[in-house]
UniProtKB/Swiss-Prot annotation:
It comes from Chlamydia trachomatis serovar D (strain ATCC VR-885 / DSM 19411 / UW-3/Cx). CDD domains: BRCT_DNA_ligase_like, LIGANc. SUPFAM superfamilies: BRCT domain (SSF52113), DNA ligase/mRNA capping enzyme, catalytic domain (SSF56091), Nucleic acid-binding proteins (SSF50249), RuvA domain 2-like (SSF47781). Its cofactor is Mg(2+); Mn(2+). GO terms for biological process: DNA repair; DNA replication. This is DNA ligase. HAMAP family: DNA_ligase_A (MF_01588). Belongs to the NAD-dependent DNA ligase family. LigA subfamily. NAD(+) binds at residues 33-37, 82-83, 112, 135, 171, 285, 309. Pfam families: BRCT, DNA_ligase_aden, DNA_ligase_OB, HHH_2, HHH_5. Residues 581-663 form the BRCT domain. DNA ligase that catalyzes the formation of phosphodiester linkages between 5'-phosphoryl and 3'-hydroxyl groups in double-stranded DNA using NAD as a coenzyme and as the energy source for the reaction. It is essential for DNA replication and repair of damaged DNA. Its EC number is 6.5.1.2.
Amino acid sequence: MGAVSRDDYIALCTELVEHDRRYYVLNQPTISDYSYDVKMRELQEIEVQHPEWKVSWSPTMYLGDRPSGQFPVVPHSSPMLSIANVYSLQELEEFFSRTEKLLGYSPGYSLELKIDGIAVAIRYEKRLFAQALSRGNGVKGEDITANVSTIRSLPMRLPQEAPEDLEVRGEVFLSYEAFEELNACQREQGKLEFANPRNAAGGTLKLLSSKEAAKRKLDLSVYGLITDQKKRSHFENLQLCSQWGFFVAGMPKQCRSRQDVVERIREIEEMRAALPMAIDGVVIKVDNIAYQDRLGLTSKHYRWAIAYKYAPERAETILEDIVVQVGKTGILTPVAELAPVFLSGSRVSRASLYNQDEIEKKDIRIGDSVYVEKGGEVIPKIVGINLAKRSLESEPWKMPSLCPVCHEPVVKEKVSVRCVNPLCSGGMLEKICFFASKSALNIDHLGEKVVTKLFEVGLISSCSDIFALAEEDLKQVPGFKDRSIQNLLASIAGAKKVALDRLLTALSIPFVGSSGAIALADHFGTLDKVIEASLDELMSIEGIGPKVAASIVAFFSKHENREEIRRMQELGVQVLSKQSDKEAPLQGKVFVLTGTLQQMTRTQAEERIRCLGGKVSSSVSKSTYAVIAGSEAGGKLKKAQDLGLSIWNESELLRILDAKSVS
């Protein structure tokens, strides 16, 4: 690692916080586990060398799974930590040596599959299923009981030989078969497909409707048991779980020696492709429970366990073409069109090529037979070329000098090639899709396919056009029915009240992600102050370096960007100010939403309540301040009435929100 400045440190923190959010909250990771671990180790090394730089929000301080806000948060019975990863047999030997040095002798080990899913804790009371929690930050997790209860392989009642009260920990996942069924359903409904089974499982556990979750065929494999009556060994505990009706995947095995462990690792790697679910490695644990207790844990990991990660699965196929896409900030990205191949449980027909430099470095050519892998089972990429199969007539590929969409000249930057035409329809389509997406304004019923259709027929050509859509215009679009039109217009109306950080993210300011947008909103409070901010003022904000600050100033200095914001405001968009705890009128008050809202989505309502300091829970209790009852409200409304709680309709909620929240 070369010389590092504090700005470099802050930039790395910010990058990892964003990766944590994408992995744990959005279930949309963009880098491999290995790349993440390398960056995390670099961050830890910097903090050791420069402890005075360490910020309170450093990703080394938590596990990354921040609450989504949709479910109540509950403490774990004991820390639910992650397991450290190793990627080579040499690193595994270091784990063995470290463990044996701490104990003073060589313990036995158990070995099990590392399923690529979502970790959960499941509690039983009087042998009946009682509660399920996500891992969360390791100390507290979200109550996902309703969605976990839809897992058919999860026993609702345990046999008499099981202890009355116990907790199991396991991995929620989707089999390859269930994953393919789900994506087929997504395609039929015109929705985006999930990138991989883990993303699909994570998204399912976050659903607000357990009826929808039940349709997705989640599965659960148990990997741990917490009870006063547990056996002396971890392996025996897993056998007990299996006897009580839990699914324990992949033949856990006791290993007497290091060599036994290595042999088993190789056996599983050979059978990996034939397994019915995605795995990304194996977990090795000290088998004796008393030894586990002696070894203890760190702030992030168990000392008695390690995950050995396999190299990503690889396949060979033909590179049929290279197409160039224009992104939301105008960057041109080459994409490989591949002869379809099955890899890591899904059909792969495209792969990212990143940029011209990457293509030149690997000398990738159209017609090549290439090796493709999913980095950390996330995004397919080309990792090599079978030169023995290369045609003598193949030629090096070059990035076009004109934008493939608007045909204007492109500009070569340090690494990227960018179309700087503000009217380029290619970049604008991507920008509008992102603006409406879950990561930005989260406008229901306005997914990528709908945006593309509206763009192609000329109804929208900018983000602000979304708010000008009218019923009579939409009726002219083939395939749009009355109900879908009403749903879309209702979602757009709800999106007109938008939190400041959400809007800043949605504007696609170069180098400003969600973390930067939150920092700007926290510091300035209003949109006008952000727009008028100077370079020096921006650079005074922790996490905003010179490059990002210059990009923000440049963005808001452009007439077309200011005009776009002005038009949004003319069309009714109101930016919710970021209020301090002292000013927040709903500070500390807990709300529960039930039934269907008509004028905004539930997510939009929750966000507006939080902007005013309120909290949103999924369950009614004596601490609930008010229950917001929409149409078809069910059991939560009845419970609120029984407890004598305040019950508001949607109009009452909107009256409070509109009076208090608009800057």
